Amino acid sequence: MPRITKLPESVANKISAGEVVQRPASVVKELIENAIDAGAGRIVLSIKDAGKQLVQIIDNGHGMSEPDALMCVERFATSKISSAEELETLGTLGFRGEALASISSVSHFELKSCSEGMDAAFLHRYEGGELVEKSKAAADRGTTISVRNLFFNVPARRKFLKTNATEFKHIFETVKAQALAYPEIQWQLFNDDEELFHFRSSDMHERLNFFFGEEFADSLIEIREENDFLSLYGYVGKPGMLKRQKNDQLFYINRRVIQNRMLSQALQQAYGELLVERQTPFALLFLGLDTRQVDINVHPAKLEVKFEDERNIRNMVYPIVKRAVQLQDFAPDVGIAGLLERQMTQDAMNPENSLRKLEYKRAAGPSSTTDDLYRSYLSELPPVSSPPPGSIGEQGEMFSDLLAPSRDRELKPSVYDRSALLQSDENRPDPAGSDSKIWQLHNKYIVCQIKTGLMVIDQHVAHERVLYERAVEIMNNNVPNSQQLLFPQKIELKSWEYEIFQEIRDDLCRLGFNLRSFGNRTVMIEGIAQDVRNGTEAVILQNMIDEYQQNALKLKLEKRENLAKSYSCRNAIMSGQKLSLEEMRSLIDRLFATRMPYVCPHGRPVIIKISLDQLDRMFGRK
C-alpha cells in the first residue's frame, strides 16, 4: 500500500491558510487588496470582536459574475495573471489565487456580488470551505465579503490569537497603510459598530493628521525625486518627531506596502547622527520601479520583496533622503520632547491610544532651512561695536577679530580658541544687563532673540558639535594643530585602556596629540590638540579612552567617528561655565557654520525655539 498520498483539498487549504491567514489583519489585507484590484472607489470595513467575530468589506468595484465567484474560492484561481511571464509585469496587488480559498476554509464565509449589466446580485455562503447556500440578493454594483468566526475549525490557531486590543491594532495599521497609499479611494472603518473614520476626499494631509496627530503634515519634509531608474516621493519626519518604534515607517513599491531591511537601514543612515540610540525617523515613502526590477513572489503574505539590484536602489534612496533632511531647520519647538515622550508612554501602556487623534499641536513647526534661522538671529542683533576698553580683557580682541566680518560674508567652518571660551572674568559686563539680545541662562543656556520669538542653545552640546566637525576634518585631511607642552605629562593606563590607546594612537596623532610610549602601559604626553585646556591633558586623554570604549560597546561607529565624538564630548565647555557676550556670539557663529547645528554628535538637540505664538497662547493672548 502506498505511503505517500495526495492531501484532500480541504486539508491543503487549511495548511495554506496557515501561511496566508495568520490573524484577522491578514484577512483584512487580502480583502482590501482584492477590492483595490477590482477598481473600487469606496471601501467600507466593519470589524467586530477584533475580527474574530466579523470582518466585512464592501466595495463599489466592478463586481463578479456568478461563475467567477464560484471559481474565486478555488485554490490557485485568479483573474490577475494567466502565465508565469506576467509576474514580471504585474500591475495588481493580488496574483497568487490563494487568499479566498484559504480564508473560506477556516471561517464562515459569505460572498455577495453584482457586476455591470446584472439584474440582481448573488449570494454564496461557505462553512469551512464547503458551499452551503446559493441565492439571489439585492445589491448595488460591487462586492461584499463577510468573514465570520475566523478559525472556528482550527481551535489551535484561534487559541494563539492575542488580546482584542492587540489584534485590532494590527487591523488598524493594515487599513492605515492602504488608506495612505490610495488617497483617491474613499475609506470608512467601523469597529464594533462605532465609526472610527470616513475619508471622503483625497487630501493626503487630512489622512496624515488623522493617523499621526493634528497639524502633523505641516511638520514633514516632502521628498519628490525621479530619474531613469526609479521615482521616490513621500514624506520623512524632522528629528523633533523621532520615536522609538518602527510602526510609523511605511515603505511602498509601486504602491504595494512592503517590509524591507535595506530601505530601513538606508533611512537610518541618511539621518545619521541626528538619531540617538534606538530612535527611528518617521517615513512614508513610495518607490516607483520597473516591475521587472523587483520580485514580489517571495512569500505568501507578499510583504517581502527581492530587488534585482538592491545596492543600486540603496545608493539612490540614501542620498535623496540625506539631502532633503540636512537642508532643514531641525530646531524643535518648546515642549515637544515631553509631549512625544508622554504620547509614546501612553501608546506603550494602551495600544488603542495610537488609534485616536493625538492631542498635540505641532511636533516641529513648518520646515525651514538652517539659513533662515541664522538670518533671523543675525537680524535681531545690534550692530557690532567695539567693547569698552578693558571690559573683557585681552581675550576680547581675539573674539572681535573673529566676529566682526561674520555678518557680511558667508561663514565657513572654522574653530575658535577653546582657551578663550574657558577664561572667566568677573569684571566682564553681564550679558543680561546689556542690550545685546543675547543672554546666558544659569550658565548653561544661551538665549537669543529671533524674529519669530526666542532661540535657546545648550552651550555644552553646541561647542561639542563645533569640536566634532573640526576633529573629523582634521583627521580626514591629516593637518594636526598641536601645542607642545613645556612640561610633558605622564599617565599610567590600565590594561584595557592601553589596548584602546594602541588602537587609536595614530588618529590621536592626526588630531594633534604628541604621544610617546614610556615603559609598561605608561604614556608620555608631549603635545596636545589645540582645543585641550592646559592642565587637563592627562584627564582628557583618559576620559577620551573611556568614552571611546563606551561608544564602541553601545554604538556601531567607524573608528574616527567614535574618536571625534569622544574628543568633542570631553573637551567641550561644560554646563555651568560663565561666558562673555563675545564668547557666546562666537559660539553661535561657529555653530551655524557647521553642517548640522541642530543636534550634537550623539543626537541630543542643540537648539530649541520658543515662538511668539506659543508665548501668546501661554499668556492667554490667543
UniProtKB/Swiss-Prot annotation:
Gene Ontology molecular-function annotations: ATP binding; ATP hydrolysis activity; ATP-dependent DNA damage sensor activity; mismatched DNA binding
Keyword list, A-Z: DNA damage, DNA repair
Any single Gene Ontology cellular-component annotation: mismatch repair complex
Keyword presence, Membrane: no
One GO-annotated biological process of the protein: mismatch repair
Matching SUPFAM superfamilies: ATPase domain of HSP90 chaperone/DNA topoisomerase II/histidine kinase (SSF55874), DNA mismatch repair protein MutL (SSF118116), Ribosomal protein S5 domain 2-like (SSF54211)
Signal peptide feature range: none
Entry keyword DNA damage: yes
Role according to the record: This protein is involved in the repair of mismatches in DNA. It is required for dam-dependent methyl-directed DNA mismatch repair. May act as a 'molecular matchmaker', a protein that promotes the formation of a stable complex between two or more DNA-binding proteins in an ATP-dependent manner without itself being part of a final effector complex.
Family label: Belongs to the DNA mismatch repair MutL/HexB family.
HAMAP family reported in the protein's UniProt record: DNA_mis_repair
Protein name: DNA mismatch repair protein MutL
Source organism phylogeny: Bacteria, Pseudomonadati, Chlorobiota, Chlorobiia, Chlorobiales
